[in-house]
């Protein structure tokens, strides 16, 4: 069990388990490089030490979300724009993803969590594509919670890919122009079948959404914290959820 929930008093725990509990939480895990710079005296040997420390933060966040009954948790791991970073950093990040897939698979099995990856996965190294496919296949029968990693993801890229596929289906007369609706477009997105996020958390304090789930977050509640991702704990997640529960969602009405 998450240490944060173990330490929560009964009133706090009951409050967190009461509605409205977000069914789908999305997190922009920002601040890894700033954390590394802040701790550079300990991080000189590795260009992605901050990202490695950030990866260590993930299990307790997943545990806490699952224990609370969150149905889906989406983590923004690598954007389409991140390819503009140095080849060395990008290669090390992909190596980190590979190692995490291997080391955390038993974690997912133990908790019966289904893994899903979204983004333009075809642009990833073949080894990483293969490992993602294996991990997704190995957990596809689980239903406790769905953990979604956005890798080489950009919302504009997602929409372009979706519209190309939709156009192809129109051309092949699989669908008609009159069938096009918000629901149909959503079914062509990487997140097809998932509820739109109820809560979007951004760590690191930046006030922007960074080309993340732009279609899906039309009515999502936003929560920004100055805490850098490697320092983000289950307590910080609970604070975000408490803030969400105190808001009145109107869906644009």
Curated annotation (Swiss-Prot):
What biological processes does GO assign it? Answer: polyprenol biosynthetic process
User: A Gene Ontology MF term for this entry?
Assistant: magnesium ion binding
Judged by the first EC level, this protein's enzyme class is transferase
Pfam families membership:
Prenyltransf
EC number(s): the record gives 2.5.1.-
Do you know which PANTHER family this protein is assigned to?
DEHYDRODOLICHYL DIPHOSPHATE SYNTHASE 2, DEHYDRODOLICHYL DIPHOSPHATE SYNTHASE FAMILY MEMBER
Similarity-based family: Belongs to the UPP synthase family.
The record's note on quaternary structure and interaction partners says: Homodimer.
Q: What is this protein called?
A: Isoprenyl transferase
Species whose genome carries this gene: Chlamydia muridarum (strain MoPn / Nigg)
Q: Which taxonomic lineage is given here? A: Bacteria, Pseudomonadati, Chlamydiota, Chlamydiia, Chlamydiales
The UniProt gene name for this protein comes to: uppS
